[in-house]
Amino acid sequence: MTVLNTTDKRKADDTVNKLDGKLKQPRLDNFFKTNTSSPALKDTQVLDNKENNSVSKFNKEKWAENLTPAQRKLLQLEIDTLESSWFDALKDEFLKPYFLNLKEFLMKEWQSQRVFPPKEDIYSWSHHTPLHKTKVILLGQDPYHNIGQAHGLCFSVRPGIPCPPSLVNIYKAIKIDYPDFVIPKTGYLVPWADQGILMLNASLTVRAHQAASHSGKGWETFTSAVLQVALNRNRKGLVILAWGTPAAKRLQGLPLKAHYVLRSVHPSPLSAHRGFFECHHFKKTNEWLEEQYGPEKCINWSAVSEQKAKIKSSELESSSTE
């Protein structure tokens, strides 16, 4: 399948297309000397520039003082677990009827059903990829719905969990772009998120063993707002990886002019053979990031292979109780 770029023919896109035609298969170490994954950012950490220092001063508790007791109960999870820069940017969404209705639905689900991912992981994407660090957006659809898999990042599974078929195909595609890439034994993609890849599903929760069971409940409206914020806040542009028809539809109506959109079929075994392995999205992502931001901002796809993933006791506990 031919990869479609954003319809706005930007100069940077032209540069990438030219590079794509004349560059040989690069090595990952051409982009990096050393790259190690960092832990999830916490709200108390000092952010690394003036803009983010102002964001870090946002006081969730002061904001929450104006909530009614009922609203506070519904929104306690967001207050406790959503990273501050994202919370500040999205706070107007929380009091909209659709979001309060979504939270009422989830309250009932948690009382009577097994729901994935665990509550504390629903917004893990916001800590691994704070708003100011976002440079790539990877669009997912639905969290994994089997025990021990989902932890808040699309396509990623917990350490020790076998790689799902779609992720296996993602690794194969990276190997085509970068022949020296070592196929990881883990599907734990936190090192990618820590480098600035916002790994965002359309729906952030799912009922156990029932795919798409929380679709149409309000998450899609919220995650669309997340995308809107990310795209509007980054004037130099982001890379957007949209795999499959649902991902492409999520981009409709969004401000894409400044951004580099890469579309392809989904990496699922049902569709990957129709062009995913030939899309070269991983190489193109780095070529564009290097052109826009410099080589130090490229993604080290091998960081997943290089990580020494350890299953924390909390992860073991949550996996065993899901």
UniProtKB/Swiss-Prot annotation:
It comes from Schizosaccharomyces pombe (strain 972 / ATCC 24843) (Fission yeast). Keywords: DNA damage, DNA repair, Hydrolase, Mitochondrion, Nucleus. Disulfide bonds: none annotated. Its main location: mitochondrion. HAMAP family: UDG. NCBIfam families: PRK05254.1-1, PRK05254.1-2, PRK05254.1-5, ung. SMART domains: UDG, UreE_C. Belongs to the uracil-DNA glycosylase (UDG) superfamily. UNG family. SUPFAM superfamilies: Uracil-DNA glycosylase-like. One of its GO terms (biological process) is base-excision repair. InterPro entries: UDG_fam1, Ura-DNA_Glyclase_AS, Uracil-DNA_glycosylase-like, Uracil-DNA_glycosylase-like_sf. It is an enzyme of class 3 (hydrolase). CDD domains: UDG-F1-like. It catalyses: Hydrolyzes single-stranded DNA or mismatched double-stranded DNA and polynucleotides, releasing free uracil. Its EC number is 3.2.2.27. Gene3D superfamilies: Uracil-DNA glycosylase-like domain (3.40.470.10). It is found in: Mitochondrion; Nucleus. This is Uracil-DNA glycosylase. One of its GO terms (cellular component) is nucleus. GO terms for molecular function: uracil DNA N-glycosylase activity.
